[in-house]
Curated annotation (Swiss-Prot):
This is Myoglobin. InterPro entries: Globin, Globin-like_sf, Myoglobin. Its EC number is 1.7.-.-, 1.11.1.-. It comes from Oryctolagus cuniculus (Rabbit). The gene is MB. The modification Phosphothreonine is found at T68. PANTHER family: MYOGLOBIN. One of its GO terms (cellular component) is sarcoplasm. Belongs to the globin family.
Length: 154
């Protein structure tokens, strides 16, 4: 299920565009997630009160959290699959503290793909989308394996 060197290069090329504005991309990803899967908003006490897209766009906290999410994901992607040290604490907090189901990680992966395609269509064609999907699936599978070790049925 690993990615080839060429696939990792596609992933990291588009990720370079994301890093130019992590907070903006992250905010868009979270807004997309909450819009397409409103049930996910319930896991975020800090954002539950945000009911409209305009409220979400105006939220500095949402922007900060988007930055945090994509910063962590970027660190994982740059490890090109050798990300156990990054995955363990993330899985620990998401299983025991936040109780985030793996399904929600699928939802945010879909949101990431959507946002990258809408913001960077020239750099995120079918090959890059397929590579990113594979990288995000690898990430989810490794999180799920850690969840299982922790006894979390997410």
């Amino acid at each position: 299920m690993g990615l080839s060197d060429a696939e990792w290069q596609l992933v990291l090329n588009v990720w370079g565009k994301v890093e130019a504005d992590l907070a903006g991309h992250g905010q868009e990803v979270l807004i997309r997630l909450f819009h397409t899967h409103p049930e996910t908003l319930e896991k975020f006490d800090k954002f539950k009160h945000l009911k409209s897209e305009d409220e979400m766009k105006a939220s500095e906290d949402l922007k900060k959290h988007g930055n945090t999410v994509l910063t962590a994901l970027g660190a994982i992607l740059k490890k090109k699959g050798h990300h156990e040290a990054e995955i363990k604490p993330l899985a620990q907090s998401h299983a025991t503290k936040h109780k985030i189901p793996v399904k929600y990680l699928e939802f945010i992966s879909e949101a990431i793909i959507h946002v990258l395609h809408s913001k960077h269509p020239g750099d995120f064609g079918a090959d890059a989308q397929a590579a990113m999907s594979k990288a995000l699936e690898l990430f989810r599978n490794d999180i799920a394996a850690q969840y299982k070790e922790l006894g979390f049925q997410g």
